[in-house]
Amino acid sequence: MEVTRLGLGLAEIPRHDDSQSDVEAAGRILNAALDGGINFLDTSACYGETEEMMGKTVAHRRDEYFLATKCGHVTGGATGQAWSVETIEQSIDRSLKRLQTDHIDLVQLHSCPLEVLEQGDVIEALQRARDAGKTRFIGHSGDNEAARWAVESGHFDTLQTSYNLVEQHGHTKNLLSLAGEKEMGTIIKRPVANGVWGKTSSPYAYGDEYHRRSEIMRELGPIGDEPGDPYMLTMGFTLAHPNVDVAIVGSHNPAHVRSNIEMVENQLPIADSVVQEIYRRFEQLEDDWRQLT
């Protein structure tokens, strides 16, 4: 299956208490994405009840989407230690049950620390799951030194990492290019920088740093040919990188999903001069801006 460049991230799916209303709301969002042509769905064992919601609402459409989830943390009433082999194995088995599927397309380590990656046990656990047919591919989701190690190691099929107009280490440190050279799939989280470009504040706690960077970059003045829609600018910048395979965006409602699809299909790409100017500003102004995990 060739995945769409726009994917749906499940971190923002409504989930309060796994009530029927939450399940129905999640189903409307998920089905709107599939109906609109999105075929990449990304969730995690630690995203509340989203795996169960997916199983209840779109398991019957399983052949229509590439299913990615993550593991490593102790969640869902499980016992044990984070990043233990037992936790990894239990998490994958629990995800299969929740998602109501006999296989997952991609299982990713969720922000696994560098020292744990270097030990190798969790990677071997993923490899055994792949050999057993529980997952088709294995990946790492993370940033900074751990992300580079994951790419250079050659153990993983995919990398999920943060990349956007105020988070450009994937470009400046050649991480995305290196992943491309190794024929890894690249999945981008936070591709629209939490919507901070042009805003006076951020609704997300970890978006404060993004907002600060945005303000510094914008102080250099307007960008020629900059799209009037900040969302179009940010998504256009992210998808302009030649080594970005899919960008995952969350949503609270079906209308937002449909709007995202329409924008990506009909309003992109943005002018290359805009992309190059954003590169220039980041490289000129960054002050050891590390990736936010």
Can you name each region flagged by the protein language model?
Residues 1-65:
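N-terminal binding-site loop/beta-alpha segment at the start of enzyme catalytic domains
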Residues 3-7, 39-40, 46, 64-68, ...:
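Structural preference for beta-strand elements that scaffold enzyme active sites
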Residues 8, 33, 41, 54, ...:
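Conserved, mostly hydrophobic/aromatic
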Residues 11-13, 44-46, 70-74, 109-114, ...:
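Active-site beta-loop-alpha junctions enriched in small/polar residues
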Residues 17, 31, 77-166, 170, ...:
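Glycine/proline-rich, positively charged
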Residues 29, 34, 39, 153-154, ...:
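Structured C-terminal cap/extension of enzyme domains
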Residues 51-71, 124-135:
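Alpha-helix-loop-beta-strand connector modules within alpha/beta enzyme cores
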Residues 64-67, 156-164, 267-274:
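Short hydrophobic/aromatic-enriched beta-strand-loop microsegments
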